Amino acid sequence: AIELGKLSLWLNVIHKDMETPFFANRLTVGNAVIGAWLKVYNKDEVYGIKGRNNKLEQNKWWERAPHRIKFYSNRVNRSINEVYHFLLPDNNMLGVRSITEQKKANKEAYDRMTTILKSWTASINAADFATLQRISAKIDVLLKDYFTAQISIDKYTNNRKEIWDGIDHAESDSIFKEEERMESYARKQQLFDTRYGHDNAYHKLKLVMDYWCALWFWEYKDAGDLPTREEYWGDIEALLAVDNSKIDSRTQQALERAGASSLFDHEDDFSRISEDDAQIVLKTQKEILTEAHANISLFANEEPLRLQIVERLAERYHFFHPMLEFIEVFWLRDGFDVICGNPPWLKYTF
C-alpha cells in the first residue's frame, strides 16, 4: 500500500529535472480504528475512591474519555498528575470472552481471563499511581527523543529545491544548506529506516502501544501468558529501558515525596517540565545512523513470549497509532488540517 501510494504521488508531481521526491516519512499504513493515542487521565480520574472503612474502591477510568496531550515547541505539555491512557487496562478488554461458543470450549482459559481482568481493573493506590507517573515520565523522554530524530530525518530527506518561489535556499540558514543535502534517495531511505531499529525510541513506543491494543484481542490459547497488571507495567518499563535519572526533575521530586498528598492535590507550573529540561537539539546524520546500530535487540536473551504474542497480534490486526506515526504534525501543528475517510457513510437528509 505504501509503495503504491509513493508511485501515485510521484506520477502526480513529476517534472523535468526534478529530484526524486522522498515520501517514506509521509506515508504509513495500518488499521486506523485500532490504536492508542497520546492521551492521558488525570489523577482524580484513576485514583481509587475511598469507600467504607476508608477502603479504596474502583474509580472506573475506562468509562471516561482520556484527554489529548498538547506540545510546546520543545517539550510535552503533560502534568505529573496525568498518566498515559495506554498504561491502564480497560474493563472491556479480552473481547474473546464474549463469544459464547469459544467460552464453552475454553472454560479454564475463560476463568483465568476473568480473574486477570478483575485484577486489571482493581483500584489504583498511591504506589500504583507512582508507578504510572514514573513510566509516563519515561515515555515523555522517548517521545522527545523520537520527535528530535523525526524532525532531523525530515530535514535531511527534504527535497533540496523549492518549486514555488524560485529562490535558491542553498545560501540561507535553512534545511537546504549544501552540507545538509542528501547524496541519494538510498541514503534518505537508510536514514528513515533507523526508526525501525530495536533500540529506537519509535520502535519502543510502538511496541508499548501495540501491547495495550493486543490485550483487547488476546486469544484463549495464550491465556496462560496473560500478564497481571504489575507484570504489564513491568514489561512496559523494561521495554522503554529509560534510566530513572533521565526523567524530568519534577517527576523525580514528586516520586520522592509521594507520601505528601498535597503535592498532587492541585496543578500549577511546578507540576510541568521546565523549558530548561527540554531543549530540542537536532541530530546529525552520523548520530542517527550510529544510534540505530547501537543495539541489535532490546533484550539480552530471547524475546519474552508475551511480547512475541503482542507482535503476532500487531501483525495480524495492523494496530495504528496516529499521534505516534505523525508526531511532528501533532507536535508542531496540533494535528492535520483535513482528514479524508472511507465508508461507512452518513447519509445526509434535508
Range-by-range predicted roles:
Residues A1-F350:
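SAM-dependent methyltransferase catalytic region
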